Regions:
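Loop-helix junctions at membrane interfaces
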Residues: 1-198
């Protein structure tokens, strides 16, 4: 009976965190040092909380739920949502797996930072080979025009790969680190609620 109650709590918590993450996806804002089409949100925060509280699978499910909710209103033909899911799943999957094996503050920090690093590194080839070529086709936007948006900020970058390495790689890592920092601020107060403790 207790095991059944625990499973229900995990499923309910995962679903609720997925809904919160979906709302946070809409609360995005531009960053002055990035091209206007690159925006910051903290929608991985609930997924990271789920990954720490319930395990990596729950965190990945939160990433899936938020993107499925966002899908009907997408303007990217699901390319952006698929990218968001893959990156988020890598981030919270790595973080949750490491924390599951080492449930200490150090384990959480190492897991979150390593997850952010993996997400940032993988984002470069994913953007280079899939996302940006898809956007070029979908929006009939020349690749040179996209590169020009980066060069308007830093004229020294030449080529898409350089743009991704100089701008997107550190941005994605910092985004993950920000989610991690926020998680460490709110996780302890939320933990009793997530685990059904008073």
């Amino acid at each position: 009976m207790q095991n059944s109650t625990s499973k229900v709590r995990v499923l309910t918590g995962t679903a609720m965190l997925g809904a919160v993450a979906a709302v946070l996806m809409y609360l995005e804002f531009p960053i002055p040092i990035m091209p206007a089409f690159v925006k910051l949100d903290v929608s991985e925060l609930p997924a990271l909380i789920a990954g720490f509280a319930y395990g990596p699978v729950s965190g990945i499910l939160v990433c899936l739920i938020k993107n499925l909710i966002k899908l009907p209103s997408t303007s990217t033909a699901a390319v952006g949502e698929l990218f968001n899911f893959v990156m988020g799943a890598l981030f919270v999957g790595v973080a949750g797996l490491i924390y599951k094996r080492n449930k200490t503050r150090k384990g959480a920090i190492v897991g979150a930072l390593l997850g952010a690093l993996v997400m940032a590194v993988v984002s470069v080839p994913y953007n280079y080979f899939i996302v940006y070529p898809a956007y070029v086709v979908m929006y009939h936007l020349p690749l040179d025009a996209i590169i020009g948006m980066y060069q308007a900020i830093n004229p020294n970058v030449n080529g898409l790969l350089a743009c991704l390495l100089v701008f997107n790689l550190p941005f994605t890592f910092v985004k993950g680190a920000l989610d991690a920092a926020l998680c460490f601020l709110v996780y302890k107060p939320l933990s009793p609620i997530l685990h059904g403790r008073k």
